[in-house]
Every structure is written in structure tokens, then in C-alpha cells.
Amino acid sequence: MKLEQVPTPAYVIDLAKLEANCRILQYVQEEAGCKVLLAQKAYSLYKTYPLISQYLSGTTASGLYEAKLAREEFPGEVHVFAPAFKDEDMEELLGITDHIVFNSERQLRKHGSRCREAGVSVGLRLNPQCSTQGDHALYDPCAPGSRFGVTIDKIPSDLLDLVDGLHFHTLCEQGADDLQTTLKAVEEQFGPYLHEVKWLNMGGGHHITREGYDVDLLISEIKRIRKTYNLEIYIEPGEAIALNAGYLATEVLDIVENGMEILVLDASATCHMPDVFEMPYRPPLRNGFESQEKAHTYRLSSNTCLTGDVIGDYSFENPVQIGDRLYFQDMAIYSFVKNNTFNGIGLPSLYLMDEQGDCSLLKAFGYQDFKGRLS
């Protein structure tokens, strides 16, 4: 079965592109002498973990469930960070994780000693108060009032007695130049501590596999930090692992005319690609162009009752007909990890596409998946 034959709606993962991304990340690991971890919050299709784990050193989790999934399905290190931990979750985490990073001094003092007794390496998240995000203020952990990380004025005096390593995460879909800027701020504020700890985790948001990313600068900065402070370095990209490695296949169910032609699809921004609203952004579409760029412009909408469930305006070289198929691109990341069944809309099936373009069904969803979440 080829992509054009897959029943819609469906997420289709391009295994060749996924592996190509992983090879780039493996190159960074080897050249920089660091460890690259998969941030599961962006991509957690665990049936592909055997492939990814051939290239990466482990995973990072945002809580108990992701940590359990990693320990069960992904060979390698398991790291965990959360703004706060429940006592019952911590009890289970101690048996399955290698690193736990705390967000505050209070959380560190509450759980840190238990972690060390269990053989878990302990870290503290820093807030270098260095904002480098121009278009993603919603995702800026260094924004005023952010709940993430400890600022330099809140560092506990006995920090080095409490932690093995330090962590920061300030980037979102950014380049190595922004990491370089952030590292300068981290060194200026926290440099004395870096000389004393064992490891530094530089977090995620590194768009390493994006075309034009300065991989050489990333490698040189990691090498510099390693040499200067004698540290083990971790980075934990999410999007970079599966960037441009997935499609959302959809069908045109109807065309409504109201000042313009509106396509009603069997895919939904609200249900199937919520980042359209949360970033917000306009997802790339195969053979689709900017509004008015080509001869035929349409508004792409969804089959829900939410008026604002609109994906965006696109133009096409040829008219679109009812029954035509459209393919949204870069749909492996922050898609099925965030989707939902609002309005009783079904979840898209999951397919894997091999190097020959043949697609195989991984999982199909139905009514019981909708009903099973309710009672």
C-alpha cells in the first residue's frame, strides 16, 4: 500500500527520513563527545524506538508515564524532569530512572536524598534569564514570571552538596547561535558551579536536523564546554528526531462557498494538529502554496462543530475536488502525542512507510478508543 492508498485520516511516519535524522544526531554525539536523548514529549511512537535507539543514548521524560514507556521500550539512559513530583510517582521513578532533574530548591530538598540513596543522579534546572525566542513567547522558559528553573539569586548555598549535575532548557526550534548566546549567560552566572558538578544537560529546542542548522557550531560549543569544565554533556532534542518525517493524510469531504471556497476535511486542527492553534503556525502542505500565490485559493477547515477549527488558507495550481486527498507535512512531531477525540472525532490511524514507499498499518482507532476515555 502506497501513501496515496492509505485510508484517511492517518499519520504516516517516513522511516527513511526518521533514520536520516538519527544519523545526523549520532554524528553530533560522536564528534562532540556528548550524549543525545530523545525528548518523548515531542515524539513517542515507541514502535520506532528500536530504530532510534541504534543511534541515540537514551530518552528524557516529563513524568512517570513517559519514563515507564522509555524503560520498557528504549534501551539506554532514562532522564526525567518535571516542575514538581508527587510522592507516589517519585517512589516508582526511583526504580526506573538514571537522572532526575528538579525544578526548585524545595523539590530538590524534598526528594534529592532519596534519589541518591537509590543510585539516581540528581540535577537542578537553571533559569539563566536569557530569552532568545522572538516568535515563540509562549514557549520561552526565561520569560518574566516563568515557573521553570532556579535563577542565580535563588541558588542554594549548599548546592554542590545536593546535586550531581545542572540542567537548562531555553530554546524552541532554534539554531546553534542561540545556544551559544545562552551558554554565555549560563557561564557568566553559574560558571563556578560548572567547575564542580559532573554533568550539564543543555535541554532541547535544538533544531539540529533542520536545513541550514550550524552543526559545526553546535559541536564546537559542546566541545568547548566539555573541555573548560570537564563535564559530561547531554542534549535532549525532540523535534529534531522526527523533523519532516511524517504526513497527515486527509480527504476533502465537502466544499462550502461563503465569500470563498472552504474545504471540509476529515482531519481537524483542534483534534489532530493542535499546535496549529497553540504555536500558532500554518502547517506545510504537499503541493499547497501561500494564499493567492497560485490560481485556486481555499480555506482548509475541519469536520467538527468548532467554528474556529480552521487550518489555514492555501492555494493550488489546479482546482480541488470533493474526494481529493491532501497531505500535511512534518506531522510526526507534537501531533499524535497531543491529539484528542473532541466532538467525537476519531483518532487518525498510524502507519509506517518504508524506504520503498510501502505503508503498513501500525494501529487503527475506533469508537471504543473514544468511549474508553469516558465513563
Describe each region flagged by the PLM.
Residues 188, 194-197, 217-228, 314-327:
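Acidic/histidine-enriched ion/cofactor-binding microenvironments in catalytic or ligand-binding pockets
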Residues 221, 235-375:
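Charged (often Lys/Glu-rich) extended helix/loop segments that serve as interaction or gating elements
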Residues 2-75, 81-84, 268, 316-329, ...:
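N-terminal capping/small domains of soluble enzymes
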Residues 180-185, 214-220, 250, 315:
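Charged helix-capping and loop-helix junction motifs
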Residues 34-199, 221:
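Active-site-proximal beta-alpha core segment in soluble small-molecule metabolic enzymes
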Residues 130-132, 172, 208, 241, ...:
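Feature marks short, surface-exposed loop/turn motifs that line or immediately flank catalytic pockets
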Residues 39, 170-171, 200-209, 237-239:
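Glycine-rich beta-strand-to-loop/alpha-helix junction loops that act as flexible
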